[in-house]
């Protein structure tokens, strides 16, 4: 039997150390990774997958402790001994984090940061260091590496920053690369490029890879073996082909089944709810003492669209295509040129009150409910905050509406006195939806509402949204980079690129018959 490169035995992870009130986050799991293997660790948010990976190199937060044994080839080490873990970090085990903009230092160039990773473990003359860094940037296929060497993280796109993170992780030629959700925040075309890059680097660097994700689909053709995690336990493991053919656990079966087996709501009217004409958004370029003006950035360029009553309009496009600027403009949260009109009876109100009334009818659900929900407010206060601000309902009426909104998203009454950190990602998104629908809006803007959720929870949230649309006659502006998901829920779709709508039509037409080259590329990238 081959000796594993890395073994984790009886790994348990606790919140509040090992005290009496400690909460067990991960329970007695075992993981083996062999030389040259691509192993995927799959689970929803809060399952313990990222904590398990961080424990291998001693990067757990101070309030969280790990117990268990690790084995690197034939060397045993204690997961509680941080000094022994330091010798692996960076040199033997490289780590790629989910959000490179947070992980990279904004004050230093990428060349300097990669160079520091190298000199931490090796003595290299400065004359040779730059050449080594540029060679790494070439290996990760970063365009124009000589020029990028002197760039700062904010000057790079999300995909470029992730390539820099990969270069840093590879800088000391580790034997194992741990990639923690490295493609979650990326659009489909860049996601595919990063996955292809990892696949090629595995061969050229003779790497083992531990790939952590909530998306089982993306590792189907990459991983040799799978570990499926749920609520801190490994519930299924095996060769990828075997798990996909004959999953044994109900949760795994739910992850593997086609994304959504539900029927979108029928359109019963052609009446327009909202129209946007000649819509443009420009952001001012940087100013300085020595330069009074610079070129403004055009985020939206003369966009025309309309949304019907009860319709879901899907918006797809890569990062930087203008999707979020479109949402913010429709919410009237940023300055714009053009005309946005909500085709509803308007009461006679002052200008300030008209805007308040407009925003009551147009609500938004954000991508990350953990960031958009205040950690200091109870769920009762979060859901009721918006409707209380309008001061048109009594205390009893507000309470009644809070309970109704909660029941509509299938959450129990005892939820109200708890706080966001006590809930899973899917539950937090239900709370965010309840906060939006309590306002009784006509249009709900859904900005990547399921991108951070695993397939099983994603299906539940999409089914909930479709049920709410049928019950409340809601219109949706559904923004996502997931073409398959958008096509499932949408009645019509628009494709955005460089601030413009470059293609539009029914999902069937865009996915099968579009003649637009950009749309074709998005479709091809979304099929792994």
What annotation goes with each model-predicted range?
Residues 234-238, 246, 504-505, 513:
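ABC ATPase "signature
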Residues 171-175, 438-442:
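A short, proline-enriched helix->beta-strand linker immediately N-terminal to the Walker B motif
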Residues 151-156, 160, 419-423, 427:
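Conserved ABC ATPase signature
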Residues 219-221, 486-488:
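A short, surface-exposed alpha-helical micro-motif characterized by mixed small hydrophobic
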Residues 128-147, 397-414, 524:
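Conserved ABC ATPase "signature" region
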Residues 69-87, 125, 196, 339-357, ...:
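ABC ATPase NBD Q-loop/coupling interface
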């Amino acid at each position: 039997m081959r000796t594993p490169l890395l073994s984790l035995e009886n790994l348990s992870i606790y919140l509040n150390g090992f005290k009496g009130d400690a909460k067990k986050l991960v329970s007695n799991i075992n993981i083996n990774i062999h030389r040259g293997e691509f192993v995927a660790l799959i689970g929803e948010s809060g399952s313990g997958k990222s904590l398990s990976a961080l424990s291998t190199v001693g990067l757990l937060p101070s309030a969280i402790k790990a117990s268990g044994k690790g084995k690197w080839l034939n060397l045993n080490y204690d997961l509680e001994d941080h000094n022994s873990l330091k010798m692996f970090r960076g040199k033997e085990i490289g780590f790629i984090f989910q959000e490179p903009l947070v992980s990279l230092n904004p004050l230093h160039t990428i060349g300097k940061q990669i160079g520091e990773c190298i000199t931490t473990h090796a003595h290299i003359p400065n004359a040779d260091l730059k050449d080594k860094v540029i060679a790494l940037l070439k290996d990760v296929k970063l365009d124009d590496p000589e020029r990028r060497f002197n760039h700062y993280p904010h000057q790079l796109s999300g995909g470029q920053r992730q390539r820099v993170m990969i270069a840093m992780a590879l800088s000391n030629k580790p034997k194992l690369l741990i990639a923690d959700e490295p493609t979650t925040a990326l659009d489909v075309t860049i996601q595919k490029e990063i996955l292809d890059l990892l696949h090629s680097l595995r061969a050229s660097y003779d790497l083992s890879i531990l790939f952590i994700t909530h998306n089982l689909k993306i590792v189907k053709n990459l991983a040799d073996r799978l570990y499926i995690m749920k609520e801190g336990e490994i519930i299924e493991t095996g060769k990828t082909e075997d798990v996909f053919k004959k999953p044994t656990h109900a949760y795994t079966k739910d992850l593997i089944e086609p994304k959504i087996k539900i029927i979108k709501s029928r359109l019963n009217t052609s009446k327009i709810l909202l129209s946007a004409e000649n819509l443009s958004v420009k952001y001012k370029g940087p100013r300085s003492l020595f330069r009074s003006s610079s070129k403004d950035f055009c985020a939206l360029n003369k966009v025309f669209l309309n949304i019907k009553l009860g319709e879901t309009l899907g918006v797809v496009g890569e990062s930087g295509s203008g999707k979020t600027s479109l949402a913010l403009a429709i919410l009237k949260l940023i300055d714009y040129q053009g005309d946005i009109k909500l085709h509803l009876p308007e009461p006679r109100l002052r200008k300030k009150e008209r805007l308040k009334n407009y925003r009551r009818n147009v609500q938004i659900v954000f991508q990350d409910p953990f960031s958009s929900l205040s950690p200091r407010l109870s769920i009762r206060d979060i859901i009721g905050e918006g409707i209380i601000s309008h001061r048109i309902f009594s205390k009893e009426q507000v309470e009644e509406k809070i309970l109704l909104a909660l029941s509509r998203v299938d959450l129990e009454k005892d939820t109200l006195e708890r706080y966001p950190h006590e809930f899973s990602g899917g539950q937090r998104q239900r709370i965010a939806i309840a906060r939006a629908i309590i306002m009784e809006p006509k249009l709900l803007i859904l900005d990547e509402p399921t991108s951070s959720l695993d397939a099983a929870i994603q299906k539940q949230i999409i089914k909930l949204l479709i049920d709410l649309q049928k019950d409340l006659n809601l219109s949706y502006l559904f923004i996502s980079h997931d073409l398959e998901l958008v096509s499932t829920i949408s009645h019509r779709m628009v494709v955005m690129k460089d601030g413009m709508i470059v293609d539009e039509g029914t999902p069937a037409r865009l996915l099968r018959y579009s003649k637009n080259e950009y749309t074709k590329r998005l479709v091809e990238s979304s099929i792994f």
